[in-house]
């Protein structure tokens, strides 16, 4: 009976995160050493400006700076090594992702193949071809029906010269008859109008006729009088 479970193996992502935290800690230490070195640099410059210069203090500051630089370089080397491991993990993760993608693609294609195989069995190629042939025949029949319905009735056109001349003569006679009939109608209308005008003149009273005559006579006398003057 086991009372304690074994440690779970870390994944690449977990290992990468651990390295990322390590790099972050290294950067913090390097930044701290840079600040300390900057302070030492300023103190050395201040000591150099003093008169007389205290060389003992300057040497002590230089030794302290050398010690900090050594520690800083250790951290810089560790950072470079850690980042190299991170790069390798990135490469492995990339390769693993590609393999997993290939596996997923294979599974998807396999499942699709099964579905396609199942569905293709439901398709009868012969029936589809027959359906296509039937549709083509229906379309051709429809075109033929349309051509039949849109065609004009056959009219015999084989006429000899005598038949053509006879038809033309009939047309000329028909035109002449129409012209004569129109002339007769026009003449009848004109005669009828003249007869109506004659009747109207006969119905005008004698007084009106005399008045018209007097009016015409007056107009003539006025005209000649103006002319003589």
Swiss-Prot record:
Residues 16-78 form a coiled coil. The gene is VPS60. Possible candidate for an effective malaria vaccine as determined by epitope response in sera. Signal peptide: none annotated. PANTHER family: CHARGED MULTIVESICULAR BODY PROTEIN (PTHR22761), CHARGED MULTIVESICULAR BODY PROTEIN 5 (PTHR22761:SF12). Gene3D superfamilies: 6.10.250.1710. Belongs to the SNF7 family. Disulfide bonds: none annotated. It holds the Pfam family Snf7. This is Putative vacuolar protein sorting-associated protein 60. One of its GO terms (cellular component) is multivesicular body. Keywords: Coiled coil, Merozoite. GO terms for biological process: late endosome to vacuole transport via multivesicular body sorting pathway; vesicle budding from membrane. The keyword Nucleotide-binding does not apply.
């Amino acid at each position: 009976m086991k009372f304690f479970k074994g440690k779970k193996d870390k994944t690449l992502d977990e290992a990468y995160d651990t390295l990322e935290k390590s790099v972050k800690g290294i950067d913090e230490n390097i930044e701290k050493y840079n600040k300390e070195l900057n302070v030492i640099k300023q103190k050395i410059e201040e000591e150099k400006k003093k008169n007389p210069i205290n060389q003992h203090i300057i040497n002590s500051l230089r030794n302290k700076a050398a010690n900090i630089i050594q520690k800083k370089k250790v951290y810089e080397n560790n950072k470079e090594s850690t980042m190299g491991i991170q790069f390798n993990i990135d490469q492995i993760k990339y390769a693993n992702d590609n393999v997993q993608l290939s596996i997923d693609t294979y599974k998807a294609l396999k499942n699709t193949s099964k579905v396609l195989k199942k569905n293709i069995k439901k398709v009868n190629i012969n029936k589809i071809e027959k359906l296509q042939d039937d549709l083509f025949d229906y379309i051709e029949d429809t075109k033929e029906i349309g051509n039949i319905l849109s065609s004009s009735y056959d009219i015999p056109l084989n006429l000899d010269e005598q038949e053509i001349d006879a038809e033309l003569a009939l047309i000329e006679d028909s035109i002449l008859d129409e012209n004569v009939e129109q002339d007769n109608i026009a003449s009848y209308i004109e005669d009828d109008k003249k007869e109506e005008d004659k009747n109207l003149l006969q119905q005008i009273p004698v007084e009106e006729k005399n008045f018209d005559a007097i009016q015409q006579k007056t107009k003539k006398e006025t005209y000649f009088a103006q002319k003589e003057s």
